[in-house]
Amino acid sequence: TSGRPSPTEAAHVAEDLSGKIAMIIDGGPVGIGIESTIIDLTEDTPMVLRPGYITPQMLSKVLGKEVIIDPGIIAADDTRKPKAPGMKYKHYAPKADMVIVDGTRKHVIAKINELVASHRDDGKKIAVIATEETKQFYDADVVLSMGSRADEDSIAHELYRILRDCDELDVDVIFSESFSTPRIG
């Protein structure tokens, strides 16, 4: 269903579709944890309609030509509509407000701790999404680890599960380190 982070295990599907389906076959948690890549090959220039595990760079190597990303999903304004299904709704978004902080490790830790302190003063329940390497540096109500920064597969695998955990923990705001995962989109 739209408006929720994508399901990564049978319990998530049951929660999202309760009363709407008769049965769930549980094959275990997803292997990767992020959306599949959708690509349009109907034009001369291949276009990624929904970014996922397979990057435009990977596709370019296989196809032997440049692969572009649908301008409708990267446009700053709302004038261009995405071509792919599933890009219209905020199905990646947790219920809480979320801020992603980018920069050097030292800067990110300092900024997130500053944000945590200011929101704590407002009485908000706060989650921080970090890595194994940095989780000990945060003092939030909830600190969740995406795994090791060196393990892109783990980070991708944990993304939607952690966003759902934040929903279940009923946090008001989430501060997250940014994650560059060039190998997996």
What is the predicted function of each stretch?
Residues 1-185:
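Active-site-adjacent structural elements in enzyme catalytic cores
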